[in-house]
C-alpha cells in the first residue's frame, strides 16, 4: 500500500488496517514455519506497510502535540 493512499485514511481506519495487517503477518509467519508459504515476499510487504502506517500515525500525533503546544 502506498503512503499517499495511507495518508488519505482516517486514524480509525489506520488502526483497523494495522490490526488486520498484524494478524496477516502472524498467519504468514505461521505458514513460513510450516513450509506452506507460497510467496515469501508478502512478509516483507506486510512488514513495510505496518511500518508506514505506524510512521503516519506518529506524524499525526506529533502534529497534534505541536498544535496543542502552540495554542497555549
Swiss-Prot record:
Cross-referenced SUPFAM superfamilies: Ribosomal protein L29 (L29p)
GO molecular function, one term: structural constituent of ribosome
Gene3D superfamilies, alphabetized: 1.10.287.310
Keyword Ribonucleoprotein listed: yes
Cross-referenced Pfam families: Ribosomal_L29 (PF00831)
Gene Ontology cellular component terms for the protein in this record: cytosolic large ribosomal subunit
InterPro entries named among the record's database cross-references: Ribosomal_protein_uL29, Ribosomal_uL29, Ribosomal_uL29_CS, Ribosomal_uL29_sf
Family: Belongs to the universal ribosomal protein uL29 family.
Name this polypeptide is given: Large ribosomal subunit protein uL29
Source species: Caldicellulosiruptor saccharolyticus (strain ATCC 43494 / DSM 8903 / Tp8T 6331)
Gene (UniProt): rpmC
Amino acid at each position: 500500500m502506498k503512503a499517499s493512499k495511507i495518508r488519505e485514511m482516517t486514524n480509525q481506519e489506520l488502526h483497523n488496517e494495522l490490526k488486520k495487517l498484524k494478524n496477516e503477518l502472524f498467519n504468514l509467519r505461521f505458514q513460513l514455519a510450516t513450509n506452506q508459504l507460497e510467496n515469501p515476499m508478502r512478509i516483507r510487504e506486510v512488514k513495510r506497510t505496518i511500518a508506514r502506517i505506524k510512521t503516519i500515525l506518529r506524524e499525526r500525533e506529533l502534529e497534534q502535540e505541536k498544535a496543542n503546544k502552540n495554542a497555549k
